[in-house]
UniProtKB/Swiss-Prot annotation:
Glycans are attached at residues 185, 343. This is Prenylcysteine oxidase 1-like. It comes from the Eukaryota. Disruption phenotype: Increased susceptibility to ocular infection by the Gram-negative bacterium Pseudomonas aeruginosa with increased corneal opacity, hemorrhaging and higher corneal bacterial burden despite increased neutrophil infiltration. It comes from Mus musculus (Mouse). It holds the Pfam family Prenylcys_lyase. One of its GO terms (cellular component) is extracellular region. It is found in: Secreted. Residues 1-22 form the signal peptide. Its EC number is 1.8.3.-. Likely to have oxidoreductase activity. Required in the mevalonate pathway to regulate prenylation and enhances the bactericidal activity of neutrophils.
Length: 495
């Protein structure tokens, strides 16, 4: 009888979890990953299914994922995603919902460095900046702006669709609903090809567009046009951050959802079934040993790419047909926070007092770094001022590889400390020819599928809302809300 006790306990768990059906909400939901995607989807799932659903979030690292900070000289600085676009509507909603505040902006000028000299410099006068763009590049910047605005206007439809409860089972279906074949084709055509077609000059692409893409993705203008448009939109709008650190959004959403966070590495998801309902067993390893539990719904909110850079070894067992491998590579990005004195001579300013820039983007050369920013801490007091160029400041250097000592000495006259964070930040666009699906099985979902079309914090939040709606609509068999065509007219009719 003692031997039977564990079996009875497991059976009881299975039967309780499988009490789904009809109008009954799911008993337990697993979310794998506690970055912005996992945190947001936990919040949305609780919002849709109600407060009784039990949500368990597995995280092998730190809550926040690619939203993270590093402490330098007793101040915290963003080491992951640093800012959000003014049109990041989900992120704005999260900040308001959690009672957080946007960080006070400390203005600084930007420039684009071409290896030997600055190819474009921002001034304090808006009209002079426009004149310089026109003088150097003609109306290319206007054509770029029109192209980006057209893409963003269509992309913003997703918020209206989601407000009406519509969801999509695949990335291609989502993109088609927003921009039809044009959006889908933009995942296969390059930024450069698309911009040349609308009259943007090659020189403008080489000098300006490439610099923005290197800053956002660490990639070139040969990357797909859709991801490029999302990146270029971010360069044109007002940017903002969260006072106290962007990662506060993740911890706040998990707390709001009353989610249970288990610090463990998920090793497998196994399909079971009871009374015709899918049931998923999630196995994991933690400091306390190996264990597993059963769930009605599982959301994977961490990359599933398979390449040499991946340490994600989740296996899928019992599925027929087998779960398709998400093949593709990720772009490594190293963020170095350097507390020191900038070597302004390298940028053509022998006198550091005369160096006017706080943000430096780069073209394809030099290749050893992508951006260099004089950054502010996550907590900014009313009396805070940006360090003068001749003073020791905290600089954020973004590079494709860890910086060698010689490279650090190239950028800095001297420094007190260097702290780094290495990220598999974005997909290496072009390494995968097809777009993955959100729905891997009946109630098994892959939230990070959307980053293979474009990657940003807000795009991940959009994917989180889509997956929550998809799970909800599938659970209650509301199929009219999934993968609908011609949604723009349907939504107008509903209004």
């Amino acid at each position: 009888m003692a031997r039977a006790a564990p079996l009875l306990a497991v059976l009881a768990t299975v039967l309780t979890t499988a009490a789904a059906g009809g109008d009954a909400p799911p008993g337990k939901i697993a979310v794998i990953g506690a970055g912005i995607g996992g945190s947001a989807v936990a919040h949305f799932l609780q919002q849709h299914f109600g407060p009784r659903v039990q949500i368990v979030v597995y995280e092998k690292g730190t809550v926040g994922g690619r939203l993270a900070t590093i402490s330098v000289n007793k101040q915290n600085y963003e080491s992951g995603a640093a800012s959000f676009h003014s049109l990041s509507l989900h992120m704005q909603d999260f900040v308001k919902l959690l009672g957080l505040r946007q960080r006070r902006e400390v203005v600084g000028r930007s420039a684009i460095f071409g290896g030997e000299h600055f190819v474009l410099e921002e001034t304090d006068w808006y009209l002079l900046n426009l004149f310089r763009l026109w003088w150097y590049y003609g109306i290319s910047f206007l054509r770029l702006q029109m192209w980006v605005e057209e893409v963003m206007e269509k992309f913003m439809r997703i918020y209206k669709y989601q407000a009406h409860g519509y969801a999509f089972s695949g990335v291609e279906e989502l993109l088609y609903s927003l921009g039809e074949a044009t959006f889908v084709n933009m995942t296969q055509r390059s930024v450069a090809e698309s911009l040349l077609q609308v009259g943007v000059t090659q020189r403008f692409i080489d000098d300006v567009v490439s610099a923005v893409l290197r800053a956002s993705y660490g990639q070139s203008a040969s990357m797909p046009a859709f991801a490029g448009a999302m990146s270029l939109a971010g360069a044109q709008g007002n940017l903002w951050s969260v006072e106290g650190g962007n990662k506060l959004v993740c911890s706040g959403l998990l707390k709001l959802a009353k989610a249970t966070v288990i610090h463990a590495t998920v090793t497998s998801v196994t399909l079971h079934s009871t009374e015709g309902k899918a049931l998923y067993q999630v196995a994991y390893e933690s400091d306390k040993g190996n264990s597993s539990d059963f769930y009605d719904i599982v959301v994977i909110a961490t990359p599933l790419h398979l390449d040499n850079s991946s340490n994600n070894n989740i296996t899928f067992e019992g599925f027929t047909p087998p779960i398709e491998d998400i093949q593709g590579s990720f772009q490594p990005t190293v963020v170095s926070l350097v507390h020191g004195y900038l070597n302004s001579s390298y940028f053509g300013f022998p006198d550091p007092k005369l160096f006017p820039f706080a943000n430096i983007l780069t073209t394809d050369f030099p290749s050893f770094f992508c951006t260099l920013d004089n950054i502010c801490p996550v907590n900014i007091s009313a009396s805070f001022r940006r360090k003068q160029p001749q003073e020791a400041a905290v600089w954020r250097v973004q590079s494709p590889k860890p910086l060698f000592r010689t490279e650090l000495k190239t950028l800095f006259r001297s420094y007190y400390s260097v702290q780094t964070a290495e990220w598999q930040a974005h997909p290496l666009y072009g390494s995968r020819r097809t777009l993955p699906r959100f729905a891997l099985h009946d109630q098994l979902f892959y939230l990070n599928a959307l980053e293979w079309a474009a990657s940003s914090v807000e795009v991940t939040a959009v994917a989180a809302k889509n997956v929550a709606l998809l799970a909800y609509n599938r659970w209650y068999q509301d199929l009219d809300k999934i993968d609908q065509k011609d949604l723009i007219h349907k939504v107008k009719t509903e209004l």
